[in-house]
Amino acid sequence: MSFSDFSKVESIKSLNEFLADKSYIDGTTATQADVTVYKAFQKEFPQFTRWFNHIASFTEEFEDLPAGKAPAASGSAAAAAEEEDDEDVDLFGSDDEVDEEAEKLKQQRLAEYAAKKAAKGPKPAAKSIVTLDVKPWDDETDLDELLTNVKAIEMEGLTWGAHQWIPVGFGIKKLQINLVVEDALVSLDDLQAAVEEDEDHVQSTDIAAMQKL
């Protein structure tokens, strides 16, 4: 279906109904068909398009915006617009001018958002507390050396905590040790691999528990 002329309200209603069960004009992804319809609408309603795109940038802050009054179009303003239209005066400017103004408003909005975010300061780093099980080879494994080697592992964002020895049978004890990690800095897979590099003492490792702080 073609939507290239929005000079009539019926065309807008038809497009709205057409998109009731669709996200795109044609197919399941954005295509030139969407671009054509968008530009046709923008050409017919450039100021509305600019306003709509600009207000859409405030979506996450709708609830925080101050109260305001929606002005009604006055008769004199409508008459003046009609008169200027009769004189072939371009009320809205070119599409390039609209795009430039919209881009300017967008950049201004991004700058305001960045300033507000900077004023709030950085968010605290997300952290998790992890309980790691480290299993030795047998009952003859030197557990003190095993523990020393584990705690010798250093990573940015890693803090070792308390530990205990848990009997698993046949005289074998596994190391259960707590640690705190910064989620963005420490990969638990990399940490387990580092612990398991101690092949003389470590048979395997498991994440016994994990909880966000």
Curated annotation (Swiss-Prot):
GO CC annotations?
cytosol; eukaryotic translation elongation factor 1 complex
In this record, what's one Pfam family?
Answer: EF1_GNE
Question: What CDD domains does its record include?
Answer: EF1B
Give the record's keywords alphabetically. Answer: Elongation factor, Protein biosynthesis
Where are the annotated segments for Disordered?
67-88
Q: Which InterPro entries match?
A: Arc1-like_N (IPR053836), eEF-1beta-like_sf (IPR036219), EF-1_beta_acid_region_euk (IPR018940), EF1B_bsu/dsu (IPR049720), EF1B_bsu/dsu_GNE (IPR014038), Glutathione-S-Trfase_C_sf (IPR036282), Transl_elong_EF1B/ribsomal_bS6 (IPR014717), Transl_elong_EF1B_B/D_CS (IPR001326)
Q: Which stretch is the leader sequence? A: none
Q: Does the keyword Ribosomal protein apply?
A: no
* Molecular function via GO: guanyl-nucleotide exchange factor activity; translation elongation factor activity
Question: Which PROSITE patterns does this entry report, sorted A to Z?
Answer: EF1BD_1, EF1BD_2
Q: What spans are recorded as compositionally biased (Low complexity)?
A: 67-80
Its domain of life reads Eukaryota
Subunit record text: EF-1 is composed of 4 subunits: alpha, beta, delta, and gamma.
**Family affiliation:** Belongs to the EF-1-beta/EF-1-delta family.
PANTHER family, alphabetized: EF-HAND AND COILED-COIL DOMAIN-CONTAINING FAMILY MEMBER, ELONGATION FACTOR 1-BETA
Function field: EF-1-beta and EF-1-delta stimulate the exchange of GDP bound to EF-1-alpha to GTP.
Q: What is this protein called?
A: Elongation factor 1-beta
Q: What species is given as this protein's source?
A: Candida albicans (strain WO-1) (Yeast)
Name the lineage. Answer: Eukaryota, Fungi, Dikarya, Ascomycota, Saccharomycotina
